[in-house]
Each structure stands twice: as structure tokens, then as C-alpha cells.
Amino acid sequence: MELFPIIPAGGILALLVALYMTSSVLKEDTGPKEMQTIAAAIREGAMAFLNRQYRTIAGLALIVAVLLALLTRQYHTAVAFITGAFASALSGYIGMYVAVNANLRVAAGARNSLNKALTVAFRGGAVTGLAVTALSLLGVTSLFYAFGGATNPTRAPLDIVGFGFGASFVALFAQLSGGIYTKAADVGADLVGKVEAGIPEDDPRNPAVIADLVGDNVGDCAGRGADLFESTAAENIGAMILGIALVPFFGVKGIVFPLVARAAGIIASIIGMFFVRAEENQDPMAALNRGYIVTSILAIIFLYPISRYMLSGPGVNFIYFYGAGIIGIVLSFIFVLITQYYTSYDYRPVKEIARASITGPATNIISGVAVGFESTALPVVFISLAILGAYWLGLKSGLPGGGLYGTAVATMGMLSTAAYILAMDTYGPITDNAGGIVEMSGAPEEVRRRTDRLDASGNTTKALTKGYAIGSAALATFLLFSAYIDEVKIALNIKGNFPVDIGKPEVFVGAFIAAMMVLLFSSTAIRAVGNAAQYVILEVRRQFKEIPGIMEGTAKPEYGACVDIVTRGALKEMVLPGLIVVITPIIVGLVLKAEAAAAFLMVGTITGVIVALFLNNGGGAWDNAKKYIELGNFGGKGSEAHKAGVVGDTVGDPFKDTAGPSLHVLVKLISTITLVLAGLFI
């Protein structure tokens, strides 16, 4: 157990570095009064939404915790659920607080140099990445030992599955409400402001502009933070459950290996973060990529001694497990490249949509849907190769049943860079907000150019991290499916395989319902954006009509009215899709039993991953097709192609920022629900 101290050391170091970076960001110059006033409105709106969101989620979580205690008759599960929910909410709160304070400092820093603004923005994002991964690691570790991990290590992992369920529960509602908020505000601001009134983006005359900027934080910052928090927590717990079978070969090392690997990944991310700096004329994306490459190389290096020490035994060659970990790290790189290909305007798919816009909105939509469907192929091929490759390496290791553990190590490899990836993701809304503050405050053109460059790189990082999130979700849910099968075998005292026969009517029906649920959930999430956006559109139109002088700039819009309308709409609309996901797997498991629940989990994961890829990449491609036209291609701004591009972008908004990211959470939530309630499905 000599490597055990790395676990608390990695978590505590991450929190200390996050504290240092928070202090570093808050010490920066806050700029002129005009910037401070705008930033204060964004901060007030974002924190008010977060407080109301968490109050709503807390009430729902309390009800679920009581039901869990009554159904499972185990206080461990309910305590773990509440702990996971609280830790997930806390990490989101920390990230949001720093993001809404960093945006102003980035805008002010852009008056001096690009590097100053980049450093502040990335450090603001790094706080979220470090807080999320540290709280996930420390939460799982603390519960493992609190529930008897030192004396009964083969039982404790089964008692802490509620932590993953709690994290997933909060993540689903945080991602849903945040996604509904950000896109309802965005659609409302764009359709009335840009299309009807003909004013540019982030124009202070637009009554929905503050709500739009608030939405960037609650969707991309708090939502994605909760998403990756549950990925790391659920993956750790799933791998620990698989590790129970390895105790005869590795002792307790097989169970705690995921925690040590996670801590090493956090340390690699911390080092990589300090390599992010850029010259005035350098592309900010190059600086961010440098840090990512350093993080990935260090993760590969650190994984070697950990694998050698913890996964070696009589007749077992650790090098195969090390190879499986490298597969996971390489897969994360490949996912980034695939996402970039389908969502960047440097490549064919986006240019194809932009060209189709010349003949109107209909051909834009047709082309975007085609690109979205096409974009599912390569990710599925590489996920499949990664799972098969890692499984084969696990089998070659000499460990009986080592194939599944090989896939677990691959998942650990992919998630080893999670802290850095999440820092890149939160960097996106911070730079977006900074650009809005600069635009609304009337800063000089040079400052706007700097924030535009940062914002462009931020849009790229947001798209890339969605690709990473769905790839890690796919691997994590395969791991959790294996953990569910293991738990059922333990409950039934089965020594061999537990076959899932899709030819049985009840098993087929369980699978069928899962595919339907994914599409029904997506429908309700997209409709929720439309419903909430209608309220915003009506309010913006009302203000343009009833408040004279807004368009002339002599009267100030009522920003707070739009913020309040979107907040109430998002919290109301999140309930139905959320309940669909929580209730459906429970009904399937209780009525159709464990084998049908396994089929539900398997098909729900497959359908969820593919639909999420379609929604994320299709929406991202529509967004950048519009941006490509705005650069002066196919007629530029104001042309018929541009109008068609705006329509496509508006359709893609709820795809890529609401339904798509929520599906990442859905596939993990159905896994953790079935894990927690497996005993009731027997």
C-alpha cells in the first residue's frame, strides 16, 4: 500500500492549487466602471439561478434519498447518495463562482495583452477542473474507508455505488436546467435581436443580452462540471467493483488502483496547466494544446510505475494493462480530432453546410442533419476498437477474466486528463463572457480583437470537450454495465457467466424501451428550450415596442426581466425529462427483472451515445457554418446565405447545448440507478 498516500495527496494538492488559482484570478485588475457594471449583472443573474436551481434539486434529492433508504433497507446507499449529490453541487458552485468573477478580469486583462487575458481565463477554468476531480476522488475515497474499506475491502465498493447515483442525479438536472436556460436565452436574443431588429451579437440594446451571457456559465460551466464529476466518480466505483474479483491475485491493490491512477492523472493535469502561455500574435489554441500534450505525456509516464506496482502478480504481466491505459489516453486524442473535423470551419463538413445555405434554410437543415448522422461513424468505430483492444490486452495479461479489467484501465486512461479537459471547457464561457463585456462596454478595437481570438479558441474547446465527454461516457458505461453484471452475479451467487438473452420477450422489451426512452428524453429536452424561448421572445419584443429609445441607445432595456423569465422557465421545464430518465429504468427492473434491466442498460447506452454524437456534432457544425459565412464567405453577413445560417444555428442550439450534453449524463445515470437497485431486480 506504499502508493496509497498518492490518493489523498493528489486530491488535497488539487484543492490547494485551485485555491491558489482562485486567489490569483481575484487579485487581477477589474477594469473601468462600465465593465464592472456589466459583469455584476452577469454575476448576479448566474448566482441567483444557481441558488434556485440547487434548492429545487435538493428537494428532489432528499425525496430520492428517503426512497432509497426504504427500498434498499441500507443506510449506506442513502448516505452515499446524499454525499455524491452534495459534492457534485459543491464543485459546480465553486466553478461558477470563479467563472463569473474571472470574466471581468479577462476583459480587463485584454486591455494589456493577449497572454494576460489568456492566463486569467485558463486559470479560472482550471479551478473548475481541479475542484471537480479532487472532490470526486476525495469523496469516493472517504466513503470507501468510512464504510469499512480497510477491514472489508470487498464489500465497501458495493456500499458506495450511491455516491455515483447522487452525482449523476445532480448532474442530470444541472445539465438539463443549465442547457435549457442558455439556449432559451440564446435563441430569444438571436431571433429577435439579430434577425428581427438587425443588431449585432452582445449589443447592449438587446434586452436578452445579459440572460444570454448568464446562460454561457450555467450551461457550459456548471453543467459540464457536473457531467465530468459523475464520469470520474462512476468510473472509479465501477472499476473498484470489478477489482473485487482480483483480490486473490493483487489483494486490495486491485480495488484501490483506480483511485491511485486518478490521483496521478490529477497531478499530471496540474503540471500541464502551468505550460499554458501565449505570445501576442500566437494562436491561443496552440497554447492550450501544448498544456494538453504535456498532461497526456505525463499521464502515460505516471501510469507505468503504478501499473507495475499494483497490477503485477504470479503469472500476470502488468505491461498489458499499461497498454490498455495508453489506449484510453490515445482515444481521448482521437475524439478531439474527430470532433474538430466535424465542427471546425476549416474542414469539409462545415463548409458543405455553409454552401448549402446559399439556396435557403431548408437545404441548410438537410445538409446539417446529414453531417450529424455521418459524424457518428468514426467515433463508434474508434470506441469499438478501443474496447476490443483493451479487452484483448487484458486477456493477454495472464489474469483470469482480465479482459474486462483491461477495459476498466482504458477508461481510467481516458479520464486521466479530465481535470485539464474540464479547465479547457470552462475557459470557453469565461472568454465568451469577456467578449460580451468588452463589446457592451465600448472598449477599443484592439481589445475586442484580443477577446475575439480568445472567444474563437473558447468555442473550439467547448466543442472538443463535448466529444471527450461522450467518449468517456461510452467507456465508463461499458465498465458500469460490467459492474452491474458482477453485482447481479454476487447477489445470485453465480460463479460463471450471467447471460443476457435478447430472444426472451421481457429482455427484448427492456431493450426496446431503452431506445425509446433516449429519443423521448431528447424530444422533451429540445421542446423545453422551445417553450422557454417563446417567453423570452415575447418579452424582448414587448420591450422593443413599449420602451421608447432602446434602439437609439437613449433608454436602457430591462435586463432583469429576461433573466427572471428564463430562470423560472428553465427550472420548470427540467422536471419532465429528468423524471423520465429516473423512473423508466426502475420500472423496467422491478417489473421485468435483472436480465431485462441489463438489456435496458446496454441498448440505452448504445442509443444514447449515438444520438448524443448526432446532436452534438450536428449542432456544432450548424453553429460554425454560420460563423464561416459571417467571415465573408457566400455573401457574408446580411446575405440570404447568412439568414439561412442563422436559422440552422438556432435549430442546432438545443441540439448541441441541451439535449446532446444531457444524454452524456443520461447514459451514466441509468447505469448508476441499475447498480444501486440491482438487489431489487433479482
UniProtKB/Swiss-Prot annotation:
Pfam families: H_PPase
Subunit structure: Homodimer.
Species, as recorded: Moorella thermoacetica (strain ATCC 39073 / JCM 9320)
Cofactors required: Mg(2+)
Keywords (A to Z) from UniProt: Calcium, Cell membrane, Hydrogen ion transport, Ion transport, Magnesium, Membrane, Metal-binding, Translocase, Transmembrane, Transmembrane helix, Transport
Subcellular location: Cell membrane
Gene name in the database record: hppA2
Annotated residues for binding of Mg(2+) 1: 186, 190
Enzyme class (EC, first level): translocase
Residues that bind Mg(2+) 2: 216, 432
Binding site for Ca(2+): 623, 649, 653
Protein origin, superkingdom: Bacteria
EC identifiers of the protein: 7.1.3.1
Gene Ontology, cellular component aspect: plasma membrane
Annotated transmembrane regions: 1-21, 56-76, 78-98, 130-150, 160-180, 237-257, 258-278, 291-311, 318-338, 353-373, 375-395, 404-424, 468-488, 506-526, 574-594, 595-615, 662-682
Function: Proton pump that utilizes the energy of pyrophosphate hydrolysis as the driving force for proton movement across the membrane. Generates a proton motive force.
Protein name (database record): K(+)-insensitive pyrophosphate-energized proton pump 2
